[in-house]
């Protein structure tokens, strides 16, 4: 049986690129490609899949109404999926215990957990603030992978 460490091992395979799927209002699936990493939840310490979404996108609306997502990562023919309930923390989605400074650092933590690097984190922070970026956490209630893993 797969676990979140199987998911984590694939992050370096393609810069943390994943396909994240949510449910639209009409029950159909909405999928897109984003970067994700595995890290401790900022409040509970639980190991979660973290992503950063630009403020105002439809996917955030989906997660506000139906807080559940599926995230699939792959490297070559190896893949793993994590699915579960979601939490949001951002300027439009306040989370108790996460103030503006903690959010700034949290967005960096997710970025680096996804394999990201940056030469100018002041600029990174400014862009994240201007775009009203939101941290998205998927609690891996179910993790599965291909048999070759």
Predicted region positions:
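A generic structural signal for nonpolar/aromatic side chains embedded in well-ordered alpha-helices
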Residues: 10-11, 63, 110, 138
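Short, basic/aromatic recognition patches
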Residues: 1-19
């Amino acid at each position: 049986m797969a676990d979140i460490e199987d998911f984590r091992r694939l992050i370096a395979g393609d810069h943390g690129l994943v396909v994240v799927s949510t449910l639209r209002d009409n029950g159909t699936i909405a999928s897109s490609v984003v970067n994700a990493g595995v890290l401790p939840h900022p409040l509970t310490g639980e190991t979660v899949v973290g992503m950063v979404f630009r403020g105002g996108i439809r996917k955030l609306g989906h997660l506000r109404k139906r807080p559940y997502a599926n995230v699939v990562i792959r490297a070559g023919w190896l893949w793993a999926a994590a699915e579960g309930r979601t939490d949001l923390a951002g300027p439009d989605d306040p989370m108790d215990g996460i103030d503006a400074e903690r959010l700034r650092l949290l967005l960096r933590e997710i970025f680096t957990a996804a394999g990201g690097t940056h030469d100018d984190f002041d600029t990174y922070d400014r862009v994240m603030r201007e775009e009203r970026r939101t941290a998205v956490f998927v609690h891996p209630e179910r993790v599965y992978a291909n048999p070759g893993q």
